[in-house]
């Protein structure tokens, strides 16, 4: 059966898939557009599933603030090149628009809503694309929340204050983005993290060969410095290092209730292979 160029064009516009893939699908289903679209969707799902095993550690972050909630979402691709592709940018924009119309409290709900579009994008770009994580903060006034999104869309933070002060909120959100605190105060530091750091400090102290009481003081000093570095209230304010965040809040008669910080790819284990190694490995497989 002869497949017309107009049919291929129509299917491409509906599916976003390449011309050759569209033509193959139309030939297989004897020119039926609806059946061809179903076939491409099925193939997209299979390809997306195969690619989902590949590491996606690049991408962008989107932030939205409404009258009673703020949301951050991380959308991943395998490479920065793909993250700058027009179709990826459109996918991220569509997600941002969804955040405007619906309050998502669970990333799985968002994933379900965009899964079909994600599969099409995987088919189009040829990379693993994932909606990785989402954070939503609810409040009774948008002036109680501060958000910051870096110009490259790869680093963001949001903070909820006890009292209205959107300028202070933005300053603290910017500080959180840059300084990466683990918690608001010492009580919030994960016990496993503190235990791991303590073990490292103790090993370092033993290597010094000093007396037991001196080693103990060395460990205590390092723990104290560590906690100052990783707790928000103890950190020096990035815009004015002469005061701490605690003092900044005290001067404004305000408190931090909670915060979230996203950095694209943070915590994702990426292979250390360089490009040449990957090419060589692929050639060996093909051979």
Where are the regions that the model predicts?
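N-terminal assembly/interaction segments in proteins that build large macromolecular machines
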Residues: 2-287
């Amino acid at each position: 059966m002869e497949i017309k160029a107009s049919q291929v064009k129509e299917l491409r516009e509906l599916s976003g898939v390449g011309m050759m893939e569209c033509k193959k699908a139309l030939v297989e289903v004897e020119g039926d557009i609806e059946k061809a679209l179903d076939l491409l969707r099925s193939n997209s799902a299979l390809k997306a599933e195969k690619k989902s095993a590949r590491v996606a550690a690049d991408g962008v972050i989107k932030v939205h603030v409404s009258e009673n909630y703020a949301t951050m979402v991380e959308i991943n691709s395998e490479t920065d090149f793909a993250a700058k592709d027009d179709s990826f940018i459109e996918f991220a924009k569509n997600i941002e628009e969804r955040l405007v119309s619906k309050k998502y409290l669970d990333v799985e709900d968002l994933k379900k809503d965009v899964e079909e579009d994600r599969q099409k994008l995987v088919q189009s770009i040829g990379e693993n694309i994932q909606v990785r994580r989402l954070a939503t903060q609810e409040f009774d006034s948008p002036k109680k929340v501060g958000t910051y999104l870096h110009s490259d869309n790869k680093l963001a933070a949001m903070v909820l204050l006890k009292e209205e002060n959107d300028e202070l909120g933005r300053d603290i959100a910017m500080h959180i983005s840059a300084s990466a605190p683990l918690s608001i105060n010492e009580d919030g530091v994960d016990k496993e993290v503190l235990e791991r750091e303590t073990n490292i400090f103790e090993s370092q102290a033993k290597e010094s060969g000093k007396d037991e009481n001196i080693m103990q003081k060395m460990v205590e000093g390092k723990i104290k410095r560590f906690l100052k570095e990783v707790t928000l209230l103890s950190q020096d304010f990035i815009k004015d290092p002469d005061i701490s965040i605690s003092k900044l809040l005290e001067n404004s008669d305000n408190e931090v209730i909670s915060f979230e910080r996203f950095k694209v790819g943070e915590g994702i284990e990426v292979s250390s292979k360089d490009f040449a190694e990957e090419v060589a490995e692929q050639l060996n497989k093909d051979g």
